[in-house]
């Protein structure tokens, strides 16, 4: 599906700022409606490393009332978390009624990366994907609104952005060997 996208379409930063401004204002209003109606909302940002998830998240949360949302950056599971059931750590971050939970990555990369790098069998990956489907279905059945975004860039653009981040002293910390290794294996993750 992603291979059908035209990645040559661009937007200037100025055009982006103009288009996003009324949407951010609307988001602030919607957050209060969510609070008043007791709706739990899960907003998930996924995408390639260096695709801009952090920048988009920063831009979005500036409009929100900090009393009514949590932001979670999902990292690799800790030793303790690996001893627990697959989704245990994610169950702990579910928003209460009336609140937003905003995820910088979620439960998907654990399965996707393990599958792409052939660290698990296809059967094990399918079992985890089934667990994700059940988890999300339970959230939706209990009234949660789940909104998912995937920020897509080409392998070439990702490499360019990783190099740019690595070359800048103030952003070099954001890039590691795993990012470059994953970039070389881009098509394993892509399929």
Regions found by a protein language model. Name each.
Residues 1-191:
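Glycine-rich phosphate-binding loop of ATP-dependent small-molecule kinases
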